[in-house]
Amino acid sequence: MHKAKGTAWESALRDYLNEGLTDRNAQVRRNAQTGVNDIGDLDAYPFTGEAKAVKAYDLAGFVEQANREARNAGVPFGVALIKRPRKGVGDGYAVMDVRTFRRVRARLLGVDTPDD
């Protein structure tokens, strides 16, 4: 991803996800790049967001990266946030594997599920 394009997408995501959130503790923040132990582009607790603004989608690679960076950050869920060409931020894609979706759903329902 071109650095300026990626930075713009990260900032647009942060701003969109923070709309209407007045609690500073709930706000999404952009992370500084940390190299080999990267913690993702966005701190959106309980998620780590990996922002992608690219022409060719590698969903498996994006999700694996998001999950790895969530583990590095010590948060439960990773999500790839993919820019959709010629569309607004809200029309982008939030992609996770089914295992993560299952865990998110269980948390929302307040039930336990085994960590796969």
PLM feature spans:
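Catalytic phosphate/metal-binding cores of nucleic-acid and nucleotide-processing enzymes, i.e., regions
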Residues: 1-116
